[in-house]
């Protein structure tokens, strides 16, 4: 939503088996076009339909699958969201393995995105050290643990329909950081 608000023409490809993004887009509130890909073949096929967009974002499941691997192979930037939880970071390791394998044919830029950040949490420091060990850079911006993110999902809105200036601000800063990767 933040990229569309900044004037970019955005497409989002939903590869998550839950199809929550696809279902949300049916409410008519999406500020971008949504495509659905239920298989790795769909991911490769949709790519040709995305040429007219400034950015195409692939939303996937948090676990490694054939479709996740296909999404990595067609991506220019892979954002790996992780929470300060050992189990969450362990699951992200499989995506890093796919990125390393993909580097033999075409290097794909990747960044970790820390979500549900609680500033003084001990696990946050452990997570930051674990990220360093992978060789994949983290974004400077992290998404803080905020109730507005959950409320927005439950209400079928984006955070930009809320009055939470701090949440909107961190999403806008993250968006600028993502765009900068492509400059």
Per-segment meaning from a language model:
Residues 1-69, 153-161:
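P-loop/Walker-type NTP enzyme "switch/lid" segment
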Residues 12, 58, 80, 112-114:
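Structural beta-sheet core signal
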Residues 65-85:
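Inter-motif core of Ras-like GTPase G domains
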Residues 92-107:
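Conserved C-terminal guanine-recognition region of P-loop GTPase G domains, centered on the G4
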Residues 118-120, 128-157:
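Beta-strand-loop-alpha "switch" segments that mediate conformational coupling across diverse proteins
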Residues 149-172:
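Inter-lobe coupling/hinge region of RecA-like P-loop helicase motors
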Residues 178-183:
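Short, hydrophobic alpha-helical segments
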